[in-house]
Amino acid sequence: MSHLERALEIATEAHDGQRDKTGRPYIEHCERIADTVDTLDEKIVSYLHDVIEKSGWTRARLEAEGFSPAIVSAIDALTRREEEDDLSFVRRAASNPLARAVKRADLEDNLRQASAAGLPQAKYRKGLEILDKEFREPPRPR
């Protein structure tokens, strides 16, 4: 089994029974993010970006599954710390180059979900603004 397939399997199990802001299965949020990013490592991180925060997974367990230190570090960067405010979280996540594209896709998807569900959107807009102003990168060739 490839690392990408294993990441999807882990995320599907970890988020079983969880729902996104619109009431859909949470794994669909992870899949939308993976569909948005470009590289294989970004896709793996996309599937796993919330497994530490929203389930019983740990860094050590992900490492034991054979995910590279770079992937595990990116997942850790995308894991909110206790007492961490939204904007500090965005900045910390974006400081990890592998996590940055995933965080952007995550914020964009959360913004769409919040809009569809009639929920507040300001924190997602502000997070995207921080990425645009403080972490702007030239577009990647396609």
Predicted ranges, named:
Residues 1-142:
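Active-site helical microenvironments for divalent-metal-assisted chemistry
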